[in-house]
């Protein structure tokens, strides 16, 4: 038995295929989803989506927050942005992380600090999506 996973952003369909299992980052921690999972709707945190493909290979995806619905072996993940780990340029991601860290260090005031922290979380997630060992 398999799951049908659909990952959507406002601009495109990132993934729409059958999978064996996923591990999803939610606002209350990671959840694993196997076939016949109980129905659930949950907020999706900035984090990694791990997808176990039908050939037992693992694929990673960086998700930038949103929500997910699981029902009758159908998983729909709606997020602000998503990138497959294999599509992320490692050098660009590392540079973005370094810039985000520098921006956090020089942030002044609450608003700049919050925005810099959010940018740093996004940058770390992109780097993590590249470096996850399958």
Curated annotation (Swiss-Prot):
Membrane topology summary: Peripheral membrane protein
Gene Ontology terms for molecular function: ATP binding; proton-transporting ATP synthase activity, rotational mechanism
Keywords from the UniProt entry: ATP synthesis, CF(1), Chloroplast, Hydrogen ion transport, Ion transport, Membrane, Plastid, Thylakoid, Transport
Matching Pfam families: ATP-synt_DE (PF00401), ATP-synt_DE_N (PF02823)
Gene Ontology cellular-component annotations: chloroplast thylakoid membrane; proton-transporting ATP synthase complex
Domain of life: Eukaryota
Signal peptide feature range: none
Swiss-Prot/TrEMBL GO biological process terms: proton motive force-driven ATP synthesis
Localization, UniProt: Plastid, Chloroplast thylakoid membrane
Principal subcellular localization: plastid
Function summary: Produces ATP from ADP in the presence of a proton gradient across the membrane.
Similarity comment: family membership: Belongs to the ATPase epsilon chain family.
Subunit note: F-type ATPases have 2 components, CF(1) - the catalytic core - and CF(0) - the membrane proton channel. CF(1) has five subunits: alpha(3), beta(3), gamma(1), delta(1), epsilon(1). CF(0) has three main subunits: a, b and c.
The protein, known as: ATP synthase epsilon chain, chloroplastic
Organism, as annotated: Glycine max
Record gene name: atpE
């Amino acid at each position: 038995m398999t799951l049908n996973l659909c990952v959507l952003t406002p601009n495109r369909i990132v993934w729409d295929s059958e999978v064996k299992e996923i591990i999803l980052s939610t606002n209350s921690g990671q959840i694993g989803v196997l076939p016949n999972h109980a129905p659930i709707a949950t907020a999706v945190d900035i984090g990694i989506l791990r997808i176990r493909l039908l050939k037992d290979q693992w694929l990673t995806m960086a998700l930038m927050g949103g929500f997910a619905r699981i029902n009758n072996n159908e998983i729909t993940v709606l997020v602000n942005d998503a990138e497959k780990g294999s599509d992320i340029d490692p050098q660009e991601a590392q540079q973005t992380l370094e810039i985000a860290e520098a921006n956090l260090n020089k942030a002044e005031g609450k608003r700049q600090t919050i925005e810099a922290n959010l940018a740093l979380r996004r940058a770390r997630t992109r780097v993590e999506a590249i470096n996850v060992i399958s």
